[in-house]
Curated annotation (Swiss-Prot):
Its EC number is 1.1.1.94. This is Glycerol-3-phosphate dehydrogenase [NAD(P)+]. Pathway: Membrane lipid metabolism; glycerophospholipid metabolism. It comes from the Bacteria. Sn-glycerol 3-phosphate binds at residues 107, 135, 137, 190, 243, 253-255. GO terms for cellular component: cytosol. Belongs to the NAD-dependent glycerol-3-phosphate dehydrogenase family. It catalyses: sn-glycerol 3-phosphate + NAD(+) = dihydroxyacetone phosphate + NADH + H(+); sn-glycerol 3-phosphate + NADP(+) = dihydroxyacetone phosphate + NADPH + H(+). GO terms for biological process: carbohydrate metabolic process; glycerol-3-phosphate biosynthetic process; glycerol-3-phosphate catabolic process; glycerophospholipid metabolic process; phospholipid biosynthetic process.
Length: 331
């Protein structure tokens, strides 16, 4: 059976970009938005002027604020902010077509419960087939048709490959993996590390420090993924290392831009002011820190970011703390 009708929950930049991918892959697409102005601009101008201005949307995409509009969809892509995934899936539940797979595209750790997105989905939608999509992908580039490759993680290989085939176009290549946990851990932790890289850039600490931070951050990401039950090989791929390198290397990254502002002397409130899109790392940092503590996993960079965001320490003191750590073997 092939998929015909995709429903995308969340009409932010990434949700809109994924709607473009689905439409270009030949699917009919219903894009569910919280904001009436988004559905109005898509209907009138074929453009999401709030979150993805300047990108004309495919004709196969229709938008609605009503979750019931997804009732006939045989494939769901869930793309709300990570901290809103539970409420979004709860709203979807009475309208979810039996057997329709839910592809989780939100990256983060839920505050309070410290659960990964797949655990949240399993609680809200017991029995629903779940997959995870993650990888190096800026929304604007994907929406404009620039090429990338991503990980499509699903424990059911046959289903994972079917979903990958349904979403595949020449400029968007999903690679199947069976390690859902590894794929999720990579996506959640890299957002926190991107804030750290932004701070390094904002403080003018140089390219050497930037490269060292990405490398040591990747070690933290890997340790946490393995402690959660993921595979180191998974996070060495697109959903971990690939996503990390992209997110930590460009001010296009919402998380890195927050770090740049913090490194430049702004407060967190100033860094977030005027942003319509969510920097997931801000909400995930305290959850990642708490999760690492619960698993007894050492994550000093993530710890420092969480402390800065919580106002427990200033940027300069956090940097000094990292540079003053005892020397140890690299591996």
């Amino acid at each position: 059976m092939t998929f015909q009708h995709a429903g995308v929950i969340g009409a932010g930049a990434w949700g809109t970009a994924l709607a473009q991918v689905c439409a270009r892959a030949g699917l009919t697409v219903t894009l569910q938005a919280r904001e009436p102005e988004v559905t109005a601009s898509i209907a009138a101008e074929r453009e999401n002027t709030l979150f993805l201005a300047g990108v004309k949307l495919e004709d196969a995409i229709t938008a609605s604020t009503d979750m019931a509009a997804l009732a006939g969809c045989d494939l769901i892509l869930a793309v709300p902010p990570a901290q809103h995934l539970r409420s979004a899936l709860t709203a979807l539940k009475p309208h979810l077509k039996p057997g329709a797979p839910v592809v989780l595209c939100s990256k983060g750790v839920e505050q309070g419960s410290l659960k990964l997105m797949s655990d949240v989905a399993a609680e809200v939608l017991p029995g629903a087939p779940i997959a995870v999509l993650s990888g190096p992908s800026f929304a604007g580039e994907v929406a404009r048709g620039l090429p990338t490759a991503v990980t499509l993680a699903c424990e059911d290989e046959a289903l994972g490959r079917r979903i990958g085939q349904a979403l595949a176009i020449p400029t968007f290549r999903p690679y199947w993996a069976d390690d859902v946990i590894g794929a999720e851990a990579g996506g959640a932790v890299k957002n926190v590390l991107a804030i750290a890289c932004g701070i390094v850039e904002g403080k003018g600490l140089g390219r050497s420090a930037h490269a060292a931070l990405i490398t040591r951050g990747f070690a933290e990401l890997t340790r946490l993924a393995v402690a959660l039950g993921g595979k180191s090989e998974t996070v060495a791929g697109l959903c971990g290392l690939g996503d990390l390198v992209l997110t930590c290397s460009s001010p296009q990254s919402r998380n890195m831009s927050v770090g740049l502002a913090l490194g430049g002397g702004q407060t967190l409130e100033q860094a977030l002011a005027g942003k319509v899109s969510v920097a997931e790392g801000v909400a995930s940092a305290p959850a990642v820190r708490a999760l690492a503590h619960s698993l007894n996993v050492e994550t000093p960079i993530c710890e420092a970011v969480a402390a800065i965001l919580a106002g427990e320490v200033d940027v300069d003191s956090a940097i000094l703390g990292l540079l003053s750590r005892p020397l140890k073997a690299e591996v």
